[in-house]
Amino acid sequence: MISLKSIVDKLYNLEDLSYQESYQLFDYFIKGQIELPLQTSILIALKLKKETSIEIAAAVEALFDNTKEFPKIKGDLAGIVGTGGDGFNTINISTTAAIVAATAGYKVAKHGGRSVSSKSGSFDLLESFGVNIELAPDQTKQCLELYNMGFLFAPFYSDGFRHIKEARTILKTRTIFNILGPLINPARPNKVVIGVYSKDLILPMAKTLVNLGIDRAVVVYGSGLDEVAIHDDTYVAEIQNNQIIEYKVSPVDFGIYTYAIKDLEGGLPEQNREIIKQILLGKGKEAHNAAVAVNVAMLMRLYDKDDLKQNTQEVLEIIKSGKCFNTLQQVINYSNK
């Protein structure tokens, strides 16, 4: 076993960790074997050094090895998720996009927790709608099979996350756990859209996904947002056949207008709930509908639907039909049986 002191000394010297060292470090983290002051020091050292794809992949495996098993789903399974921490407090676009994608016929496993850095995290929103977020894995699997939608509440699958919650709250900044969050979905989706909070993270995240053997994925950075942007360019790294292809898209590539970032500002859970409800009912504002649609359109690329404009129009029609709220309502009802 590698000693914690030797790992910490390397980090204080801003040296990269080996796969084994990173695995051991995050095993210590998740088992609560690191005191709070040292936790904060380690997280800051990693941030200053900049995390490598090897360190991230090793951390993911350590966290998976300390996570409850989720039953395997037949066929493709999608994930739409952001790292959080972009600082803009926009409405819950990835959560809404997941519900819309499920309505469009794609099985989506949404994994996350309550807010650490934003005003309203994905599971804050879901609870405000009345979703029972603490379903057992077999119940969540059945919900996925019935309604194409399943919510996996992170602390339910690994209670070790309680050991690092205080450090993350104290630091009030993005840490490696923002990066790890999208990668440790216990349902292990094979087609994922991951938004990152920094352009510098696109390639490390993409390389990590390749190292983890993910089938198809896109990593996106939307000019300040951890999702596909409707206010400016989105930088993309797409993974296919273990190859990483980098490119850039803009709102015109999706066939939509360019909006202002302030058009997407969210608020407290109750305010976000009402905004999201209107979108799902087909009564949302154009900017809100567009923001959700472009993210689902990007997911559809992973299913060999390459025409982003056509994808966006298909999704907008589904949103405007109001059927998406029915999907959420079915999940709410199922989760409270």
Curated annotation (Swiss-Prot):
GO biological process, one term: L-tryptophan biosynthetic process
Gene3D superfamilies, per database record: Nucleoside phosphorylase/phosphoribosyltransferase catalytic domain (3.40.1030.10), Transferase, Pyrimidine Nucleoside Phosphorylase, Chain C (1.20.970.10)
Binding of 5-phospho-alpha-D-ribose 1-diphosphate, residues: 82, 85-86, 90, 92-95, 110-118, 122
Keywords for the protein's UniProt record, in alphabetical order: Amino-acid biosynthesis, Aromatic amino acid biosynthesis, Glycosyltransferase, Magnesium, Metal-binding, Transferase, Tryptophan biosynthesis
SUPFAM superfamilies referenced in this protein's UniProt entry, alphabetically: Nucleoside phosphorylase/phosphoribosyltransferase catalytic domain (SSF52418), Nucleoside phosphorylase/phosphoribosyltransferase N-terminal domain (SSF47648)
Residues engaged in binding anthranilate 2: R168
InterPro entries found in the cross-reference section: Anthranilate_Pribosyl_Tfrase (IPR005940), Glycosyl_Trfase_fam3 (IPR000312), Glycosyl_Trfase_fam3_N_dom (IPR017459), Glycosyl_Trfase_fam3_N_dom_sf (IPR036320), Nuc_phospho_transferase (IPR035902)
Cofactor requirement: Mg(2+)
Catalytic activity: N-(5-phospho-beta-D-ribosyl)anthranilate + diphosphate = 5-phospho-alpha-D-ribose 1-diphosphate + anthranilate
EC numbers, comma separated: 2.4.2.18
Organism: Francisella tularensis subsp. holarctica (strain FTNF002-00 / FTA)
Gene Ontology molecular function, alphabetical: anthranilate phosphoribosyltransferase activity; magnesium ion binding
Record protein name field: Anthranilate phosphoribosyltransferase
Listed PANTHER family: ANTHRANILATE PHOSPHORIBOSYLTRANSFERASE
Pfam families tied to this protein: Glycos_trans_3N, Glycos_transf_3
Function: Catalyzes the transfer of the phosphoribosyl group of 5-phosphorylribose-1-pyrophosphate (PRPP) to anthranilate to yield N-(5'-phosphoribosyl)-anthranilate (PRA).
Residues annotated for Mg(2+) 2 binding in this entry: D226, E227
Note on how the cofactor is bound: Binds 2 magnesium ions per monomer.
Family: Belongs to the anthranilate phosphoribosyltransferase family.
Pathway, per record: Amino-acid biosynthesis; L-tryptophan biosynthesis; L-tryptophan from chorismate: step 2/5
